[in-house]
Amino acid sequence: MQLYNSLSKTKKTLNKKTINLYCCGPTVYNYIHIGNARPILLVDVLIRYLKSRSIKVNYLQNITDIDDKIILKALENNLNELEVSQKYTSAYLEDLKSLNINQPDKIILISQKMNEMIDFIKNLVDINAAYVLDGDVYFDIKKYENEYCKLSGYKLDELISGKRVEIDSKKHYSLDFSLWKKTDIGIKWDSVFGLGRPGWHTECVLLIDEYFNHQTIDIHVGGIDLKFPHHENERIQFIAKNNKELAHIWLHNGHLQINDEKMSKSLGNVILVRDFIKKHNKNTLRWIFLTTNYTQPLNISDDLIYQANKFFEKLTNLSKKTIQFIIKKDLKIKSINSSEYINKFNEYMEDDLNTSLVLSLIDLLIKQINKNIVDKNLDNFNLLIGSLNYILDVLGFDNVFNYKFDNKTKELFLKWQELVKNKEFNKADLIRNKLIEQGIL
């Protein structure tokens, strides 16, 4: 399988039977919005595909339950930080379920790893990769300036002149970033450096380092907005501590726009996942994300949502026609996992998750199944139905194509046909209403 690696700027081959994967999780101070959902859905589709190819995936995700934003939210609502973080952690897990996203194998709350975090930072200080100043701890970028910014592609002098970093006069170098923050505000822990809490960039790298036993992971996933400084700072800490790369492949998904505008609070166009699902459905967002390569920006327009609705409408109508055809022809449909269509699906997915071509393949299958039904053609019908069902299932679509039914439904449909044939329309209408409720007519 080939995936685009943001570090090398080339597609890289993934050919292992066990994959270690990390994806940045949410900071739990609010409900997640649809932009937050893009990398998580990307991972879900990737893992579902890898598992369909008998590849094992060890998937780790953090939940940042310690952060200035959480403290601010708590102060605004007269709550403590724990109440805020617990509320939105639960909400996040609910949203995953609502989107039919499989939970990671391991989710770790940052607050549960505070001792390990302190030890990790102390280790960086001990090897002179970081320094302590008045209770704060900073990473020493100058020691690793030949490695720093290889992921983002920035040049150090451009970052300084462009003010892409915080100005702090007490730091050795303006690009040095915080590993431990001395503070009297909000939740804090005692450490060898004094009272404070860890910096955000250390939280993720600590979990990767510990959970995957100090080894380079196969895939690191996150939004392109996190490439600098967050992922850059994760990477440099791991290199400093372990003298090796953090990840073989860095996957970054592109920005999200809403009707050609950046999604932002100031524009008032931020769409929460739960609000989107209420208005549309859980499958709509998945389809929208699959229309464009994950590395590219994606504009969610009213027209794109309309296209998504038409897609699911086609599948609903196809489900009805398929069930009717199977009953009329008394067919037995078997599940399959191999066909020319599935081979083509695998080919597209192996090429950096080319999901736009996969959606075209699904459209082709829908047209071919419809043609077979119209022509009353049984040739390859099981293969077509099985292929479509297999592909939709691997992509994670939930209950969008249904061709299965029980004997009671079959008997009801045949009875309805008989009544119509005998022109007993009043009785037929009673059964027809039941079949409509069941999604058969």
Swiss-Prot record:
Binding site for ATP: 265
Cofactor comment: Binds 1 zinc ion per subunit.
Catalytic activity: tRNA(Cys) + L-cysteine + ATP = L-cysteinyl-tRNA(Cys) + AMP + diphosphate
Record-listed E.C. numbers: 6.1.1.16
Main location: cytoplasm
GO molecular function: ATP binding; cysteine-tRNA ligase activity; zinc ion binding
Binding positions for Zn(2+) per the UniProt entry: 24, 204, 230, 234
Compartments reported by the entry: Cytoplasm
Keyword match rRNA-binding: no
The protein, known as: Cysteine--tRNA ligase
GO biological process: cysteinyl-tRNA aminoacylation
Cellular component terms (Gene Ontology): cytosol
Group of enzyme by EC: ligase
Chain positions of motif 'KMSKS' region: 262-266
Keywords: Aminoacyl-tRNA synthetase, ATP-binding, Cytoplasm, Ligase, Metal-binding, Nucleotide-binding, Protein biosynthesis, Zinc
Positions of transmembrane segments: none
Motif ('HIGH' region): 26-36
Record keyword ATP-binding present: yes
Known cofactor(s): Zn(2+)
Record-linked Gene3D superfamilies: Cysteine-tRNA ligase, C-terminal anti-codon recognition domain, HUPs
Subunit: Monomer.
Protein family (similarity comment): Belongs to the class-I aminoacyl-tRNA synthetase family.
